[in-house]
Amino acid sequence: MAKGKYAANILKQTRKNARWKDTSYGRRVLGLNVKADPLGGAPQGRGIVLEKVGVEAKQPNSAIRKCVRIQLIKNGRQVTAFCPGDGAVNFIDEHDEVTVERIGGRMGGAMGDIPGVRFRVTAVNNVSLNQMVIGRLEKPRR
């Protein structure tokens, strides 16, 4: 390492080069996390329901978690989204428009015992899924 009176430029350049050894720095600067994200960095996304699927819970739990396979409108990517609430999947039909958000797992991954599911449904045809499950709102007729 340079230590002299006029060493600032060399020190700056060395720091700049060394930062690229940090993987999180490289991914952030190159925008790789946003590029790999189906929602493209947005907090929520809209999509069309393709099918209803049941995902088996991981051990030691034994359940079939009700999910839907959706195609995002903004980029055409397909993702699986969890339907939270008792009987929530009954309010969702194929070709409905749903709003999804991240499920909140660590490092952007899956949460709890639902493997490979990184999103959850929040609204169906612009009506809150939670309100429909409670019974406060009805699903709008199209």
From Swiss-Prot:
Keywords: Ribonucleoprotein, Ribosomal protein, RNA-binding, rRNA-binding. PANTHER family: 30S RIBOSOMAL PROTEIN S12 FAMILY MEMBER. GO terms for biological process: translation. This is Small ribosomal subunit protein uS12. GO terms for molecular function: rRNA binding; structural constituent of ribosome. With S4 and S5 plays an important role in translational accuracy. Located at the interface of the 30S and 50S subunits. Part of the 30S ribosomal subunit. Signal peptide: none annotated. Belongs to the universal ribosomal protein uS12 family. GO terms for cellular component: small ribosomal subunit. SUPFAM superfamilies: Nucleic acid-binding proteins. InterPro entries: NA-bd_OB-fold, Ribosomal_uS12, Ribosomal_uS12_arc, Ribosomal_uS12_euk/arc. It holds the Pfam family Ribosom_S12_S23. Transmembrane segments: none annotated. It comes from Methanosarcina barkeri (strain Fusaro / DSM 804).
